[in-house]
């Protein structure tokens, strides 16, 4: 089974503006290493010429941050400074507007949301944008699933653990509801949930982080898992739960409804 995650998606596109290694030199980083977005990127220019000989459109992959320039909110000062610097170096929509070719763009990897400003910045030669956390969807902008988290360091084998589980027959859940999430990423949405279900014999509440094997084991042992909004509307937990054939419990939101209407029925 090919599991959905950002790096796997980037490999399906004609050109990706991020390195696959998630690495700066010999140091692994939380961010994918960015490639230059601009006409000075000769590797990209050569790929455009190559693809144009075959068809009149090209598929591109980029992180959410460098898709277009906009104001960033609800970020700490360090992250905001880093993200703004990345946008100043170049954005994909601006680059596409300077080229005589059609493009279809896919995004993943970072959870910075897509806001209303994007609709005025999409050039005519961009046919469609499939973007994660596309809160302002519609027109050429289509919501896309976040999927699983990419490998973040050399010893990160979470994807392999899920693949191993899925290679075996599913088990029958023995309990009803599992709760395990940090509260600091979104206190407004997450504070108080543990207390609602704590002490119920049909629910398991983990207040502390557990190992990934144990985390997945608990998901499989329960029919449902509470999946509150974190840094963004969509999160990796939702897709871990779905891949393990359990039901994520989420607060109703138009974006999540739009996303699930086209995706969840196919899983």
Protein language model features and the residues they cover:
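Nucleotide-sugar donor-binding catalytic core of glycosyltransferases
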Residues: 1-239, 243-263
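Short acidic-hydrophobic, aromatic-tinged amphipathic segments that line or gate anion-handling sites
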Residues: 265-267
């Amino acid at each position: 089974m090919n599991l959905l995650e950002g790096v796997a998606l980037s490999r399906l596109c004609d050109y990706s503006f991020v390195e696959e290694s998630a690495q700066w030199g010999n140091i692994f980083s939380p961010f994918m290493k960015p490639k230059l977005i601009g006409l000075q990127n000769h590797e990209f220019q050569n790929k455009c010429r190559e693809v144009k000989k075959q068809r009149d459109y090209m598929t591109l992959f980029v992180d959410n941050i460098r898709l277009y320039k906009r104001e960033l909110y609800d970020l700490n000062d360090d992250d905001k400074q880093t993200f703004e610097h990345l946008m100043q170096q170049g954005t994909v929509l601006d680059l596409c507007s300077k080229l005589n070719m059609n493009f279809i763009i896919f995004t993943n990897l970072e959870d910075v949301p897509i806001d209303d400003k994007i609709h005025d910045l999409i050039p005519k030669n961009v046919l469609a944008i499939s973007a994660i956390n596309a809160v302002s969807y519609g027109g050429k902008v289509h919501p896309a699933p976040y999927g699983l988290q990419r490998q973040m360091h050399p010893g990160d084998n979470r994807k392999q653990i899920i693949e191993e589980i899925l290679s075996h027959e599913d088990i029958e859940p023995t309990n009803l509801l599992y709760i395990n999430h940090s509260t600091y990423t979104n206190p407004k949405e997450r504070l108080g949930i543990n207390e609602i279900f704590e002490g119920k014999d049909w629910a398991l509440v983990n207040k502390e982080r557990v190992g990934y094997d144990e985390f997945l084991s608990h998901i499989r042992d329960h029919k449902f898992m509470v999946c509150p909004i974190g840094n963004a509307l969509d999160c990796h937990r939702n897709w871990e739960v779905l891949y393990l054939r359990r039901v994520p419990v989420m607060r109703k939101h138009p974006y999540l409804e739009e996303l699930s209407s086209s995706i969840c029925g196919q899983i």
